[in-house]
Amino acid sequence: MVVMSAPTEPKSRPGTTGQRESAPEDVTASPWVTIVWDDPVNLMTYVTYVFQKLFGYSEPHATKLMLQVHNEGKAVVSAGSREAMEVDVSKLHAAGLWATMQQDR
């Protein structure tokens, strides 16, 4: 039988307190956004359809976002927690759209 002990904390370096530093509160509290990028493949009607189905947007709102993607090259389509934006990006990728996420500052 093998007995394993609990992991121990690493020893601190000289000149440090041994405590981990956390990110500033304002950075971790900032919302994240999902960005859809223009691509040469998907039809504008399809992009509008995807925005309606995935996000529940009305046709006018989905069309506005699609036109922003088409004319400006990108559009923010959702905002929220990092985990929620990871899910949104995955869904958009599954639908064949180019999407990324970034922290909104």
Curated annotation (Swiss-Prot):
Binds to the N-terminal domain of the chaperone ClpA. Residues 1-27 are annotated as: Disordered. Involved in the modulation of the specificity of the ClpAP-mediated ATP-dependent protein degradation. This is ATP-dependent Clp protease adapter protein ClpS. Belongs to the ClpS family. Gene3D superfamilies: 3.30.1390.10. Pfam families: ClpS. InterPro entries: ClpS, ClpS_core, Ribosomal_bL12_C/ClpS-like. GO terms for biological process: protein catabolic process; proteolysis.
